[in-house]
A protein has these predicted regions:
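Amphipathic alpha-helical hairpins
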Residues: 1-187
Length: 187
């Protein structure tokens, strides 16, 4: 059977659905591991948004008269696995938070690419209701990525750099290390 753009769209939609469900399981560990209260709050907030993304994808399936089902997303699984490995490293607190931000942003960028593709394909096929739903999620993914950037640039990276290179003056004098010893993830 020859596949069409509609088939590719459904395949990508199933991939995104599975990715969001995997992230619902992974985000609590990121939140628990974060030492920065603001970073913890960002992960907790995005967990709630991610649950909403799952529900929205179910709405998109409904607009297409398709049953919601996922297709294992190897891409997000790999990103999550890399994040788990970083968590298992003995980072000091600020370094851990910087590594968590990097992991979170990898996931956000993956999702933004997926949603951008889904929106373009839905628009090309005239699935206007799906476009509207997917655009809402894409905007939330962009906002989550921006929030992580703000946290990284707002002191976490400087604090981690100050611990890594105490001989260098951090760009932000207010960036004080939160902790200096090695840190293992809370399980």
């Amino acid at each position: 059977m020859i596949k069409t753009l509609h088939d590719a769209f459904l395949d990508e939609l199933r991939d995104a659905y599975d990715a969001e469900k995997q992230l619902v399981k992974a985000l609590p560990k990121l939140a628990r591991t974060a030492t920065s209260p603001d970073l913890r709050a960002a992960f907790e907030s995005h967990l709630e948004e991610t649950r909403g993304h799952v529900a929205r994808l179910e709405e998109v399936f409904a607009t297409l008269e398709e049953k919601p089902r996922g297709k294992h997303c190897d891409g997000i699984a790999g990103i999550i696995e890399e994040g788990k490995k970083a968590i298992d490293e003995a980072f000091e607190a600020n370094g851990m938070d910087a590594a968590l931000i990097a992991s979170g942003q990898r996931a956000e960028h993956y999702e933004m690419a997926a949603y951008g593709t889904l929106i373009a394909w839905a628009r090309a096929m005239g699935h206007d209701e799906a476009v509207s739903i997917l655009e809402q999620t894409l905007e939330e993914e962009k906002a989550a990525d921006e929030r992580l950037t703000e946290l990284a640039e707002g002191g976490i990276n400087d604090a981690a750099a100050a611990v890594a290179h105490p001989d260098r003056v951090a760009a932000d004098e207010d960036a004080e290390p939160v902790g200096s010893g090695p840190r293992r993830a809370r399980r």
